[in-house]
Amino acid sequence: MTTIAIVDYGVGNLRSVAQALRAAAPEADVRVVDAPEGIRSADRVVLPGQGAMPDCMSALGASGLQEAVIEAAASKPMFGVCVGEQMLFESSSEARPGTDKTPCLGLMPGEVIRFELDGMTQPDGSRYKVPQMGWNRVKQSRPHPLWDGIPDESWFYFVHSYFVRAQDPAHIAGETEYGVVFTSAVARDNIFATQFHPEKSAAMGLQLYRNFVHWNP
């Protein structure tokens, strides 16, 4: 039986992620883990996250799980969700007062930046709002096993003010337009991550999690 560890470092709605994974793959053993051993013993790892990046990185470091996450990213299938995707990169412009940026895990080259949409209007004449909250389309930038069974430009659910700017275009797996075209999914080797929330994205989100459970990078 495949064991999936959802990393619990005290931030994020882990229950909805766990429920979605169990619904997508009832044959898998889905565990919410808060100790390094739980990550090391798992076959696959999900790194969720929500809220402010400084708080997330501080909580991950304080939890004692950061090194285990980095170790897992070297060899195990890993899925990052929302801020969990952003944490995979080198730094974020979402920082505490008096600092320019927050150092992140550095598993993928690039940075996290904020939407700058002041004064911009949507096609219907309304102003863009930050954070983006709601459904939006994801354009698949390239084929990937996790896109299997998911039509291009399917709708997924977003809640975010920041997004990743990948340094290597080959790492971009999906893009979305919200005032600007931004990266909404990334992939490298055994890592896949999304800015949107699969657990809030109905059938297509469950299909994405189902593909992750059966993915053999």
Curated annotation (Swiss-Prot):
GO MF terms listed in the record are: glutaminase activity; imidazoleglycerol-phosphate synthase activity; lyase activity
Q: What is its EC number?
A: 4.3.2.10, 3.5.1.2
InterPro entries in UniProt: Class_I_gatase-like, GATASE, Imidazole-glycPsynth_HisH
Annotated active site: 82, 197, 199
Query: Does the keyword Hydrolase belong to this entry?
Result: yes
One cellular component (GO) term of this entry: cytoplasm
Coiled-coil annotation reads: none
Protein's GO biological process: L-histidine biosynthetic process
Keyword entries, A-Z: Amino-acid biosynthesis, Cytoplasm, Glutamine amidotransferase, Histidine biosynthesis, Hydrolase, Lyase
Q: Where in the cell is it found?
A: Cytoplasm
Q: What is its main location?
A: cytoplasm
Gene3D superfamilies found in the cross-reference section: 3.40.50.880
The reaction(s) catalysed by this protein are: 5-[(5-phospho-1-deoxy-D-ribulos-1-ylimino)methylamino]-1-(5-phospho-beta-D-ribosyl)imidazole-4-carboxamide + L-glutamine = D-erythro-1-(imidazol-4-yl)glycerol 3-phosphate + 5-amino-1-(5-phospho-beta-D-ribosyl)imidazole-4-carboxamide + L-glutamate + H(+); L-glutamine + H2O = L-glutamate + NH4(+)
Q: Which PANTHER family match?
A: IMIDAZOLE GLYCEROL PHOSPHATE SYNTHASE SUBUNIT HISH, IMIDAZOLE GLYCEROL PHOSPHATE SYNTHASE SUBUNIT HISH 1
Record protein name field? Imidazole glycerol phosphate synthase subunit HisH
- What organism is listed for this UniProt entry? Cupriavidus pinatubonensis (strain JMP 134 / LMG 1197)
Q: Which gene encodes it?
A: hisH
